[in-house]
Amino acid sequence: MNGDGEKGARGPGAHARKRKVRIGGASGFWGDSALGPQQLVAHGDVDFLVFDYLAETTMSILAGARLRNPAVGYATDFVDIAMKSVLREIVERGIRVVSNAGGVAPQACARALVELAQSQGVALDVAVVEGDDAMPVV
């Protein structure tokens, strides 16, 4: 317990820092409807959009794509369809996006997303998480 008798709160004023965060599930798989992100951005009053693209079959498709062309290996629909239709409004409203669309080529996905933002005349911060590719040691 903290000094206010609340369980779980950490430090003075911890309860005052709590705020509601609205998360919209924009996709559940590669090939999911492109309407989800559009509807969530237009009507969902969301703080975050989450796109889940990866499954075992998808990973094998992306690995094969990367073998043919190292510039791919990510879920291209994320950039070319999903983000293209909502990017400007996402930036204007300060909605944050979390996605695993980078697949086996997260840097390539990030580059494509930055290029899309530039083509739409919007500034976009993009972060990439990588380091889980075990193929070099297999």
Task: State where each predicted segment sits.
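Metallocofactor- and cofactor-centric catalytic cores in central/energy metabolism, strongly enriched
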Residues: 2, 15-138
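Residue-identity detector for glycine
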Residues: 3-13
